[in-house]
Design a protein with these regions (language model features):
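Class I Rossmann-like S-adenosyl-L-methionine
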Residues: 1-138
Length: 138
């Protein structure tokens, strides 16, 4: 995917909530409230972020099973795993999935998340390529 893709505020916020919930052990509702307020989400963006974040958290077991089947890899870094959980939720369980947008945004979230975690650019590109491959198989 092009690095020129701009992440939607709703998906960026949902990704942050998923990371805080699973990586830091935060309560999802508290993480969501703080993240949505910090991002200034309102209206449709707020509703989309809520649906994606809570959905990805609620479907973790199913998503993790699918990831294990599709990934063919035992260890997955936190940035890629959160992007996969979010992308799979949107692809598999959303009422109106926008498949291309879901994959594209998950790929960009994995890249941005890996860079934010301090990974070198090459590893961030590898994480985004991995997420793209797994979601295309889904």
């Amino acid at each position: 995917m092009s690095s020129a893709t701009e992440l939607t505020p709703a998906r960026r916020a949902a990704y942050e909530v998923v990371r805080r919930t699973f990586d830091d052990g935060a309560w999802t509702d508290r993480a969501f409230t703080a993240t949505a307020a910090r991002a200034g989400l309102e209206g449709r963006e707020l509703a989309l972020a809520r649906r994606l974040a809570y959905g990805a958290v609620q479907r973790r077991g199913t998503s993790d099973h699918l990831i294990a089947e599709l990934a063919r890899r035992r260890r997955i870094d936190a940035a890629a795993l959160a992007a996969l959980r979010l992308g799979l939720y949107e692809l598999m369980f959303s009422d109106h999935p926008a498949h291309h947008a879901a994959v594209d945004q998950a790929v960009e979230l994995a890249k941005a998340g890996a860079l934010g975690d301090g990974a070198p650019r090459g590893r961030a590109r590898a994480a985004s390529g991995f997420v793209n491959a797994v979601l295309r198989r889904a």
